[in-house]
């Protein structure tokens, strides 16, 4: 060939995703892509790299996540992701879109340009997610369509409003058609959908889903022709339930995602690299696990020339020392080694928090001691709906205790009111916790067993412009301000993680026997499109009946 390329990598065992094997071979890289895979006497290189016998796999891909759940700005999350061998992510900026509309989307695109991590955005399909909560913005099809002109946009994010699709809502169908007309596709959100209901999604071209919580559900989606993103996040951990149905003949339909994962957990156990390690530990061959985490995800997200280490593919790769319990040794994106990252977070003007609450708003009169109660399910964003006997005072008002706490969601954009309910599972002995992260409209959400700490939490969240807070019975607080739309911090990830740990440590002191992330769990208690009983700023919502219900049983 007689050609000189930029970089020659040799002495490596390199994954072949097409033949599902590691091969002792070489890579010749030029202009950000792999020019040739194999040994050559004709090629020369300006730079040579001895991989010292280590393994090389394609850069890992997170097929679906929400950056905001990490509490980090995109450029800060990128630093963590790259450390764990993740070179591409497909992110749904639904959260900031719900708070700040198109200005939030522009901000996320701008931030994505400050990092070598490939950040592909899927435009939020449902802002607001439903008509059962008030959001800070409304994103119709005509507002989203111009964004397809940005190279960072890869399609339409998880379509979660099943009734809108089933009933032929014109705006929802236009959003899906616009994505397809731009050469992209639409992701699905099939939580709790039956096999017949999946056909409604397939009829409009929705071809992925990340909401499978069992092997049975995963196989139903594959039978329907959908690609399955196996989720292992902070709250929702579905991988162990799904891995047993992953086979050689269907593995091409599976890839990995984290969906919602805290910065603490990414630092502690990893991102998609954790999914891979878990898969290998459960008997999935390493070649298959790494292929699922790279090439399969790229195919599912309709991205070409990504996810494989061969001629013509983007040179995104990870060097690892072993397969079973691998650690990322070195990372490359587009032919460049990722070394020290020093980007600064872009500033963002956030909307004010306009909710108004008083002690009187926390009174919850009941007709009897029987009430509908939200029951937390650890490691899941779903809840159970039960009718329980609870305590009341002499005036008939609910009295919180160690088993049953109050939970309130206050509309934060225009002070349109609040919903008040009862929740079981936080095991709080005192105080309150609160946040302006409350999927999907991100109103203010507070849970507690003492009214005064709940009001202190409200007041501090309003003053800081959004964030996370814990208040003990004496009024002492632990706080994490979230300067970017009340969702993300503009601080370095190390500082954010330290404050997250402080909050979790403080919660351990006011609760008993909790082994899940209380703040991330709290954030999903306001999500009405996920079963079974949730609460929004408009009241208590029964997913099974798909309507609001009275708290009195």
UniProtKB/Swiss-Prot annotation:
Top-level taxon of origin: Bacteria
Cofactor dependency: Mn(2+)
Keywords: Hydrolase, Manganese
Root EC class: hydrolase
Family recorded in the similarity comment: Belongs to the metallo-dependent hydrolases superfamily. Adenine deaminase family.
HAMAP family linked: Adenine_deamin (MF_01518)
Record's protein name: Adenine deaminase 1
Species name: Oenococcus oeni (strain ATCC BAA-331 / PSU-1)
């Amino acid at each position: 060939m007689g050609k000189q390329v930029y970089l020659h990598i040799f002495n490596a065992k390199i994954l072949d995703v097409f033949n599902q094997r590691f091969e002792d071979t070489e890579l010749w890289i030029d202009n950000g892509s792999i020019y040739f895979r194999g040994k050559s006497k004709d090629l020369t290189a300006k730079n040579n790299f001895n991989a010292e016998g280590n393994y090389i796999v394609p850069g890992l891909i997170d097929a679906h996540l929400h950056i905001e759940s990490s509490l980090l700005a995109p450029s800060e999350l990128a630093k963590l992701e790259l450390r764990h061998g993740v070179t591409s992510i497909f992110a749904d900026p639904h959260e900031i879109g719900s708070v700040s509309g198109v200005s939030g989307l522009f901000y996320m695109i701008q931030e994505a340009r400050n990092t070598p991590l490939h950040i592909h955005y899927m435009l939020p399909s449902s802002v607001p997610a439903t008509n059962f909560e008030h959001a800070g913005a409304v994103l119709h099809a005509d507002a989203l369509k111009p964004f397809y002109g940005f190279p960072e946009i890869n399609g339409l994010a998880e379509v979660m409003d099943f009734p809108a699709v089933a009933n032929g809502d014109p705006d929802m169908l236009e959003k899906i058609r616009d994505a397809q007309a731009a050469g992209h596709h639409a992701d699905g959100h099939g939580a709790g959908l039956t096999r017949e209901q999946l056909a409604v999604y397939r009829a409009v071209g929705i071809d992925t889903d990340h909401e499978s919580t069992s092997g049975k559900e995963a196989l139903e989606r594959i039978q329907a022709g959908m690609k399955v993103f196996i989720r292992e996040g902070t709250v929702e951990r579905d991988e162990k339930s799904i891995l047993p149905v992953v086979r050689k003949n269907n593995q091409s339909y599976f890839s990995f995602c984290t969906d919602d994962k805290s910065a603490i957990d990414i630092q502690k156990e990893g991102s998609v690299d954790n999914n891979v390690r878990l898969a290998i530990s459960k008997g999935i061959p390493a070649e298959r696990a790494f292929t699922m985490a790279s090439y399969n995800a790229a195919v599912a997200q309709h991205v070409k020339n990504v996810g494989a280490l061969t001629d013509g593919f983007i040179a995104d790769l990870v060097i690892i020392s072993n397969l079973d319990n691998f650690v990322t040794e070195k990372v490359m994106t587009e032919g460049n080694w990722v070394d020290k990252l020093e980007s600064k977070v872009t500033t963002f003007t956030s909307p004010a928090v306009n909710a108004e609450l008083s002690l009187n708003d926390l009174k919850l009169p009941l007709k009897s001691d029987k009430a509908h109660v939200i029951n937390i399910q650890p490691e899941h964003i779903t809840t159970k709906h039960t009718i329980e006997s609870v305590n009341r005072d002499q005036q008939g008002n609910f009295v919180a205790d160690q088993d049953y706490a109050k939970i309130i969601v206050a509309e934060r954009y225009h002070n349109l009111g609040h919903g008040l309910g009862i929740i079981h599972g936080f095991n709080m002995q005192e105080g309150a916790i609160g946040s302006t992260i409350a999927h999907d409209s991100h109103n203010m959400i507070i849970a507690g067993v003492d009214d005064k700490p709940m009001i202190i939490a409200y007041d501090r969240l309003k003053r800081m412009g959004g964030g996370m807070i814990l208040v003990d019975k004496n009024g002492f607080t632990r706080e994490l301000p979230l300067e970017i739309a009340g969702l993300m911090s503009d601080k370095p990830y190390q500082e954010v993680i330290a404050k997250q740990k402080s909050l979790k440590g403080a919660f351990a002191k006011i609760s008993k026997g909790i082994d899940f992330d209380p703040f991330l769990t709290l954030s999903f208690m306001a999500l009405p499109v996920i079963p079974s009983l949730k609460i929004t700023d408009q009241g208590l919502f029964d997913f099974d009946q798909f309507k609001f219900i009275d708290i009195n049983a």
